Amino acid sequence: MFIELEDLRIHPVDFREVFGPGVIDLGEEVRQRSPLLSEGRADLVEEHHGKHKVVEDIRIKGKLETSLEVPCARCLDPVIHQVERSFDLLYRPLGNDSGHEELSVTDAEAEIGYYEGDGLLLEDTLREQVLLALPLKTICREDCRGLCPHCGRNLNEVQCSCVDELEDPRWSALKEIRDKLNQ
């Protein structure tokens, strides 16, 4: 759904959209398991910068809900995430702040996104919000043992017979010092 600046100049735009799995590209590792439900409102916020300059920001306030499958960072088993997120975002026209050699940015301004042209695509905003809702590293369980670095077996399922420790000869001098200290 494209949120057009022209429509926002007339009235706020309410949205209630359902995006099936695969409609919004969430990347290779994230798989959408259920429809993404989104609803909210887009408004035009006019900001007066100086006597004759008006900046038309777009404010999108809403919520989304979906179910995602992400591989565990240690063992690669699929992990299900239920995502429910509210958002209140402000988008400013790209290039509107140009002309200044150096800008000081307040904490509030750090939260501002930018749009080009006549509006913005709701799907881009939703993609960003879904990905921000996920943890940086997904782990299937706290005690996940991961994959064997030698044979690739899932150590949560089987115990492999690989040698646990391969000695790196570059560490031998430090090992000798440690052995002397332990005596």
Describe the predicted segments one by one.
Residues 1-183:
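Structured interface patches
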